[in-house]
Every structure is written in C-alpha cells, then in structure tokens.
C-alpha cells in the first residue's frame, strides 16, 4: 500500500515536471542537459523531466527608462537629457544566449550614443531637433541590438534641460519675440481695418454718386417727356386750327374778330402802346365795320373808333 502511494506520488511529480504552459505572448527555449534543443510556441509544452528545462521569453513590447545624464553640446553647453526606449524580442534564441542583462546593456548603449549624437549639435539645434535625435538614436540602437534578437520600435526624448541662466535668457527672448509678434499682428490688423474702412468709404461715395446721377437722369427724362408732350399738344392744336380754318373757310370779319381778341390779350389792360403795321389797317377797318353792325343805331354818333396807323419800321442797313 505504501509502495503504491509512493508510485502515484512519483507519477504526479513527473507529470507536473513534464507539462509546461506558455501564455499567448510567450515563447520557450528548451534545453536538454544544458544544451539548446528547440524553441516552442505558446500553449501546452511537454518536456522530459529532470533532463530538459524551458526558459520563457516575453514577446510583448517592453519599455526601458534610461536615467537622466548630463551631455555636452557642440557649443560647450551642458544639458540634462533622458529618454525611453520601446523594444520587442523577435528571436528568443538570441535574446537568451547573446546577452546576459538586456536591460542594463541597452541602457548603457543608449546613453553612449545619446552623448555622441547631441555632441555634434549646438544647443539651439538640440532643443529644436528632438524628432531627428529620436530617429538617429533608434536606428543606432536597432542595429546594435539586432544580434540580441530584439527590435527597437521607437525612442522618445523625454527631457532636454539646459542650465538655469540659459533657461532665463531663453525665457526673456521668447517674451520679446511674443511681444514683437503681437505688435506686428496689431499693426497688421490696424492696416487691414483702415483698408476696409477706405474701401467702404469709396464704395459709399460711388453709390451716392450713382444715385445722384440716376436722379438727375430721371429728372431730365421727366422734363424731356413734359417738353415733348407740350410740343405735341401745341402741334396738334395748331394742326386743328389750320384744319378748322381750311374746312370752315373763314371770312375777313371772323379773322378780324380773332385779331381783336389777340390784341386784347397782348394789351392785358395795362397802359400799353401798340405799333401796328400798315397792313393792319384793313383788318381794323373790318373791325370798325363789325362794331357798326353790332352797335345800336342811336349810338352810332356817339361811339368812335380811333385808330392810329404808323408804317412799320424798317431795320436800318449797316
């Protein structure tokens, strides 16, 4: 009974030692009697207990935080720089057998190459060229760690800190630049405002002039229309008179009567002296005849028509 129990316990220990589980992000390097045997994927792995051993390798992306260090730039300025490195294992065999302490190895390698890269740059270039420094450092580290079975995914510079006096000088310079930029923007805004105002005044003057011109044109058109209407009316009136005279065949008595009405309008009741041509005596004679016809026979001796005739003045020849 005791022997059977011992056999069961031995079998359980052998089963526990022979079965290994690798997670999805892991790979394993199997060694047999201290010698590389094979590389296994994630899942359940069976090994020979006490003869074979397995070393697990994490295949996920990992981070190395490089400690801050002082670096001298090309113009002999001391700056404090630190960075982080993101890497992943691509070859478990090289990662296990080609480097003892990968974390310490890549840290020292990053610090050394960071000093070399920044040592070729001046302070201004160092402060404004982070992306370039990241790219160069990643390429150098990726090439150097290739034999370790790793790939450097990216490098990020976290801090570039110049000395305090330089920081103060840079702060003053930045403040002056901001004030200069603000003054330029203010002047540019005032300039644009004045341009817009001038354009608005110009447009208003143009619209006002166009409005006045349009009003003058409309007044002129109205006067023109009125004059044309008056002229057309007068023309029609004259045409009607001539037509009536032509159709009615007026006598000298009617003409003389109309002549008398015209003289009355000309005189207009004022003390006016009218000079008549010699040819008008015939018409006045007709008027006298009309007056005798219209007057009462008893009054013929009382009324008189005085006429004054005077030859028409002829213009002097010069």
From Swiss-Prot:
It comes from the Archaea. One of its GO terms (cellular component) is membrane. Keywords: Membrane, Transmembrane, Transmembrane helix. It is a single-pass membrane protein. Residues 295-318 are annotated as: Disordered. It is found in: Membrane. The chain crosses the membrane at residues 2-22. Pfam families: Band_7. PROSITE patterns: BAND_7. Its main location: membrane. Belongs to the band 7/mec-2 family. This is Uncharacterized protein MTH_692. It comes from Methanothermobacter thermautotrophicus (strain ATCC 29096 / DSM 1053 / JCM 10044 / NBRC 100330 / Delta H).
């Amino acid at each position: 009974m005791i022997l059977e129990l011992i056999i069961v316990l031995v079998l359980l220990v052998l089963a526990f030692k022979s079965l290994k589980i690798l997670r999805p992000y892991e790979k394993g390097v199997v060694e047999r009697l201290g010698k590389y045997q094979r590389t296994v994927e994630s899942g359940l792995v069976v090994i020979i207990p006490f003869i074979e051993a397995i070393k697990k390798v994490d295949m996920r992306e990992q981070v190395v935080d490089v400690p801050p260090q002082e670096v001298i730039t090309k113009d002999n300025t001391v700056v404090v720089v630190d960075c982080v490195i993101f890497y992943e294992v691509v070859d478990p065999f090289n990662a296990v057998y080609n480097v003892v302490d990968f974390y310490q190895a890549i840290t020292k390698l990053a610090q050394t190459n960071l000093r070399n890269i920044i040592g070729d740059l001046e302070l201004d270039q160092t402060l404004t060229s982070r992306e370039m420094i990241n790219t160069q450092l990643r390429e150098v580290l990726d090439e150097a760690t290739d034999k370790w079975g790793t790939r450097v995914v990216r490098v990020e510079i976290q801090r570039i800190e110049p000395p305090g006096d330089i920081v103060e000088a840079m702060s003053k310079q930045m403040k002056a630049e901001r004030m200069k930029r603000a003054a330029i923007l203010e002047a540019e805004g005032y300039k644009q405002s004045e341009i817009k105002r001038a354009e608005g005044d110009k447009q208003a003057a143009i619209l006002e002039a166009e409005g006045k011109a349009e009003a003058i044109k409309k007044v002129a058109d109205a006067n023109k229309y009125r004059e044309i209407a008056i002229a057309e009316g007068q023309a029609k009136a004259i045409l009607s008179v001539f037509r009536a005279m032509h159709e009615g065949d007026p006598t000298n008595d009617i003409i003389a009567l109309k002549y008398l009405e015209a003289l009355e309008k000309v005189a207009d009741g004022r003390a006016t002296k009218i000079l008549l041509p010699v040819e008008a005596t015939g018409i006045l004679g007709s008027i006298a005849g009309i007056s005798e016809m219209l007057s009462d026979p008893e009054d013929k001796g009382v009324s008189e028509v005085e006429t004054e005739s005077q030859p028409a003045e002829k213009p002097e020849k010069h």
